[in-house]
C-alpha cells in the first residue's frame, strides 16, 4: 500500500498518516532489540518492555566497567540524552568528564564505538571529498544504536519509565521538547 501510494505520488490521507506516525512512535519507544520487541508482542505492556530494556542497559554498564574500571565510558554513555537535549553542534566531553586529556578522550570514544552500543557522527569540514580525510576527531555527536534503549536511558532517573510517559509519547501529548528523541 505504501509503495503504491508513493509510486503514484498521492498523499496517504489523514487516517493512514496518523496510523503510520503512531507505528513510528511505537518503534521509537520499544526499539528494535529482539527481547524488547518480543516482550511487547507478548504482553503489550510498556512496563515489562521497560524492564527488559533496563536489563539490557545494565548489561551494557557491566561491560563498560570491564573495559574501563574508572567509569568514564559509563559516564559518556549515560550523558548522551542530556548532550543531545542541549541541541549543541557537538558532544561536549568537558561537561561530562573534567580534566580529561584529549588523547584519553579519543581512546574512550573508540572503546565506546567498538562496543557497538553507540554510533559516532563526526563533523567534517568538506564532506564532498573523502570523509575520512576531513573528519574532525574532536567534534562529534554520540547516538545510541537502539532508539528504544535511548528512550529508557532518557528516563533512567525514574525507577520505571511510567506507562503514562510511554502513552503520552506514543500519542504526542508529552509537553517537553523531545526533538532529541527524534534526532537519536
Question: Which residues fall in each region the model found?
Answer:
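Conserved small helical "lid"/interfacial subdomain of P-loop NTPases
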Residues: 1-5
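Accessory nucleic acid-recognition modules appended to NTPase machines
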Residues: 38-184
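Amphipathic alpha-helical "lid/sensor" segments that cap RecA-like P-loop NTPase cores
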Residues: 6-58
Amino acid at each position: 500500500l505504501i509503495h503504491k501510494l508513493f509510486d503514484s505520488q498521492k498523499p496517504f490521507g489523514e487516517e493512514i498518516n496518523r496510523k503510520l506516525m503512531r507505528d513510528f512512535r511505537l518503534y521509537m519507544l520499544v526499539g528494535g532489540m529482539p527481547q524488547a520487541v518480543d516482550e511487547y508482542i507478548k504482553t503489550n505492556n510498556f512496563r515489562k518492555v521497560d524492564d527488559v530494556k533496563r536489563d539490557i542497559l545494565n548489561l551494557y554498564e557491566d561491560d563498560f566497567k570491564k573495559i574501563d574500571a574508572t567509569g568514564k565510558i559509563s559516564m559518556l554513555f549515560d550523558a548522551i540524552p542530556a548532550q543531545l537535549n542541549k541541541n549543541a553542534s557537538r558532544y561536549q566531553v568537558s561537561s561530562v568528564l573534567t580534566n580529561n586529556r584529549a588523547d584519553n578522550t579519543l581512546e574512550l570514544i573508540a572503546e565506546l564505538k567498538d562496543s557497538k552500543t553507540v554510533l559516532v557522527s563526526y563533523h567534517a569540514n568538506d564532506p564532498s571529498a573523502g570523509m575520512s580525510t576531513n573528519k574532525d576527531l574532536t567534534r562529534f555527536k554520540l547516538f545510541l544504536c537502539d532508539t528504544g534503549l535511548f528512550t529508557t536511558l532518557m528516563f533512567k532517573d525514574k525507577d520505571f519509565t511510567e506507562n503514562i510517559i510511554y502513552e503520552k509519547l506514543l500519542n504526542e501529548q508529552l509537553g517537553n521538547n523531545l526533538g532529541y528523541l527524534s534526532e537519536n
